[in-house]
């Protein structure tokens, strides 16, 4: 079983994460931001990851630190996985009504993000849409993954939810065991 615990305490946030990559999609998520809870739950469910996440952030200021630090902690958990005998690459194209999200992942040890998301609104509930790309920057840098995503559509809720579902499915694909391949790099190391 590939299960990890990450704890991060700063002056801005206190985060406890338990992640089972070989889970069934069970989750208990509390970030203090209802819409963020919702999309992280979609990530866990569709990625078949078991996730326990408790975040206490400085929401009296805004949601930036909570979203950013959650991306950092989730990234650190995924960075911990053994890179031998995994698929390494994952992708998903997910529609949600008029919205569509495409995500591609390479767990190759080289952090890089290309994110194409143009929000039509500043907020979804009390979640700032400007933090969508920043969450994935924080995740990518700390997981050391290369990630590309593109989101189209009109309804902001649909766009972001489709993105997090695609993220879960792509990460599930990339982290799947594949005993045939050993280290999936011609360099011999990831």
UniProtKB/Swiss-Prot annotation:
Primary location recorded for the protein, binned into one broad class: cytoplasm
InterPro entries, A to Z: IGPD_sf, ImidazoleglycerolP_deHydtase, ImidazoleglycerP_deHydtase_CS, Ribosomal_Su5_D2-typ_SF
Molecular function via GO: imidazoleglycerol-phosphate dehydratase activity
Pfam name, any one: IGPD
Catalysed reactions, semicolon-separated: D-erythro-1-(imidazol-4-yl)glycerol 3-phosphate = 3-(imidazol-4-yl)-2-oxopropyl phosphate + H2O
Disulphides: none
SUPFAM superfamilies referenced in this protein's UniProt entry, alphabetically: Ribosomal protein S5 domain 2-like
Enzyme class: lyase
Cellular component GO terms held in the UniProt record: cytoplasm
Subcellular location: Cytoplasm
Record-listed E.C. numbers: 4.2.1.19
Organism superkingdom: Archaea
Pathway in which this enzyme or protein is active: Amino-acid biosynthesis; L-histidine biosynthesis; L-histidine from 5-phospho-alpha-D-ribose 1-diphosphate: step 6/9
Keyword terms of this UniProt record: Amino-acid biosynthesis, Cytoplasm, Histidine biosynthesis, Lyase
Keyword Protein transport: no
Gene Ontology annotations of biological process type: L-histidine biosynthetic process
Family to which this protein belongs: Belongs to the imidazoleglycerol-phosphate dehydratase family.
Name under which the protein is recorded: Imidazoleglycerol-phosphate dehydratase
The organism of origin for this protein: Methanococcus vannielii (strain ATCC 35089 / DSM 1224 / JCM 13029 / OCM 148 / SB)
Taxonomic lineage: Archaea, Methanobacteriati, Methanobacteriota, Methanomada group, Methanococci
């Amino acid at each position: 079983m590939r299960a990890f615990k990450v704890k991060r305490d700063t002056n801005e946030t206190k985060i406890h994460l338990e992640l089972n990559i070989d889970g069934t999609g069970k989750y208990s998520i509390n970030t203090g931001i209802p819409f963020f809870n919702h999309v992280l739950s979609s990530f866990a469910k569709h990625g078949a990851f078991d996730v326990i996440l408790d975040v206490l952030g400085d929401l009296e200021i805004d949601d930036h630190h909570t979203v950013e630090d959650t991306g950092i902690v989730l990234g650190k958990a995924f960075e911990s996985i053994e890179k031998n005998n995994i698929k390494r690459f994952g992708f998903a194209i997910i529609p949600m009504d008029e919205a569509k999200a495409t995500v591609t992942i390479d767990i190759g040890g080289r952090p890089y993000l290309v994110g194409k998301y143009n929000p039509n609104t500043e907020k979804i509930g009390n979640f700032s849409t400007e933090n969508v790309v920043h969450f994935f920057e924080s995740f990518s840098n700390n997981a050391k993954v290369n990630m590309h995503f593109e989101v189209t559509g009109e309804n902001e809720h649909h766009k972001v939810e489709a993105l997090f579902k695609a993220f879960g499915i792509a990460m599930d694909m990339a982290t799947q065991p594949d005993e045939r391949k050993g280290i999936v790099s011609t360099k011999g190391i990831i």
